[in-house]
Swiss-Prot record:
The keyword Manganese does not apply. It comes from the Eukaryota. It comes from Kluyveromyces lactis (strain ATCC 8585 / CBS 2359 / DSM 70799 / NBRC 1267 / NRRL Y-1140 / WM37). This is Protein FMP52, mitochondrial. It is a peripheral membrane protein. The lineage of its organism: Eukaryota, Fungi, Dikarya, Ascomycota, Saccharomycotina. One of its GO terms (biological process) is import into nucleus.
Length: 224
């Protein structure tokens, strides 16, 4: 079995790639990225495809994979505004998932967000909810929606996470504490990736659509 990872240079996507490439359940793990992968992610089972022309990524989606793991996302600041963020977080995810489905992919794992709701009055949560809705509508054999709380972790030597670095540092103080619910159950991106890969390969869970909350993600991440 082969998998494709989108967003593989990001916080959760890089963890998808890490755990999928280490898992014997996958023979090959493809990664389509805009920039080269870090050296530690270039293992024997990883097939790296680098292209800055994101409008052509659909053509690069391999036909011999059946599992899509996507952590493709950006921030409003990095994208230069909410409209551009929407084009990446929603439009790219949905369009690429649509191509993957047409090429025979059976499983889609999407990193969403705590509080995602297509009817939310908060633009970010509405964006995530609409992305979930449209991915589910593609009707994969199995769709797994991961809804982490505040994301913790480091990427490329810079502290990254939900909100600014100060919020992330505060969240880390509440990580797995009795007060974790007050900050939306913060979780490390590495844990999100670990759980996503595990659920993608778990044939014992037969639900067509699985929505996994941050508390459940934290619980599953503790399991070996």
């Amino acid at each position: 079995m082969n998998a494709l990872v989108l967003g593989a240079t990001g916080l959760c996507g890089s963890s998808f790639l890490k755990y999928a490439s280490q898992n014997s359940g996958f023979d090959k793990v493809y990664a389509i990225t805009r920039r080269d992968l870090p050296s530690e992610l270039k293992t024997d089972s990883v097939v790296s495809v680098v292209s800055s022309e994101t409008n052509k990524w659909g053509e690069l989606i391999p036909e011999d994979a059946t599992v899509l793991l996507t952590g493709l996302a950006t921030t409003r600041a990095a994208a230069g505004g909410f409209e551009n963020q929407y084009k990446i977080d929603h439009d790219m995810n949905v369009e690429l998932a649509k191509v993957a489905k047409a090429k025979g992919y059976k499983v889609c794992v999407l990193v969403s967000s705590l509080g995602a709701n297509e009817n939310s009055f908060l633009p970010y949560l509405k964006l995530k909810g609409e992305t979930e809705r449209d991915i589910i509508a593609l009707d994969f054999d199995k769709t797994i929606i991961l809804r982490p709380g505040g994301l913790l972790g480091e990427r490329n030597g810079t502290f990254k996470g939900f909100g600014d670095k100060y919020f992330s540092k505060i969240s880390s103080c509440f990580y797995r504490s009795k007060l974790q619910s007050a900050l939306g159950y913060p979780i490390y991106g590495d844990e999100v990736g670990k759980v996503g890969v595990k659920l993608a390969l778990d044939s014992s869970r037969t639900e067509k659509v699985q929505i996994v909350s941050s508390p459940e993600l934290l619980k599953l991440a503790e399991e070996k």
